[in-house]
Amino acid sequence: VLVFIETDNGLIGVGEGWTPGASPKALMQTIEEDVGPRLIGQDPRYHTKIFTEVWKTTALNARRGILSIALSAVDLALWDLVGKALQAPVYQLLGAFTDQVPCYASAGLYGKGKDETALAEEMQGYLAQGFSDVKMKVGGVSLEEDVKRVRAVRDAIGPKARLMVDANYTLNVPKSLKMAQAFEPYEIYWLEAPVSPDDVSGQAKVNALSPIPVCGNETETGIDRFRELITHRAVEFVQFDIAACGGISEGRRIADLAAAFHLPCTLHASSTGI
C-alpha cells in the first residue's frame, strides 16, 4: 500500500506499507481512520514527535500487526517530506555514513519443472546484472533435493559471491540443524527464518548450535520484539523491514540496539521499489 501525504505548500511525501498475508484494504482503512487524522495540522519536520505520540495513543491496540505497518507507511512518507523540503536525500538526514550499499538478489524460488540447471542459470543471471550476492529459498522440498539445489547454485556463482538461504519459517529445530549441517560444505552466509517466528527459544537454539548463523526476522514489528530476539541471541544478523517494523524512525532504533550487541543489520525490502 502506498501512502501520499501532502503539505499546505504542495509538497508530497510517499511511503509504503508491506502487507504480507494481510488485506491491503484493511491497511488502507487503518491509515485513513486511525493514523491519518492525527497528522492533520502537524509539522512533518517533527516526525519523531508525531511517531511517538501516535505510538503512545495505540498502547491498548495490537501494535504488532497492521497498525505498526500503517505507522511505517506514514513514517516513511514524513521522512520523504522532510528530505524534499530540505532538498536532501534521507540518507544524508540520517548522518550520511555512506552513499552506497551492497545489494543481493532474493530469488531462487521453487517452480514446476524448474531443475537445478535452470536455478543455477537464474542465479548466475543476477550476478551478471550487478548484484553482489544471491539468496534462495529452501525448506520446500526434501533435504536431499535442497542440497542438490544449493550445490548447483554454489557451483554456478563461484566461491566469491555470498549465498544465503531462506526457509521462510517452515522448519523445526531438529530439521533446521540437520539442514545447516548438510549445507555447511557450501559456505552459506546465513540461514534465514528457520523456525516459527513465535519460537524465539527454538531459534536461539538453532543459532547456538548451527554451523551457519541465523538471520531474522523481517516479519517482526517494533523494537521490543527485536530486543527479545537480540537478548536471547536468536539471531546473528538482525533483519527488519522499514515498511513494517515502524518505519525509518523505529528501524533506526532497532539498528542502534543491534549495534550495542555488536550484531550487523540487513534490511528486508518490499516489492514496489519505493
Predicted regions and their residues:
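Short, Gly/Pro- and small/polar-rich lid/capping loops
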Residues: V1-F4
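Metal- or metallocofactor-binding catalytic centers and their adjacent structured scaffolds
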Residues: E6-A85
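N-terminal small/glycine-rich loop or linker at the start of catalytic domains
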Residues: N9, P89-G111, R149, A156-R162
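Short, charged beta->alpha transition segments
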Residues: P89-L93, A118-G125
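Active-site beta->alpha loop and helix N-cap motifs at the rims of alpha/beta catalytic domains
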Residues: A107-A120, L143
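Catalytic domains of carbohydrate-active enzymes, especially glycoside hydrolases
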Residues: E122-K137
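Catalytic core of soluble alpha/beta enzymes
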Residues: M136, V141-S271
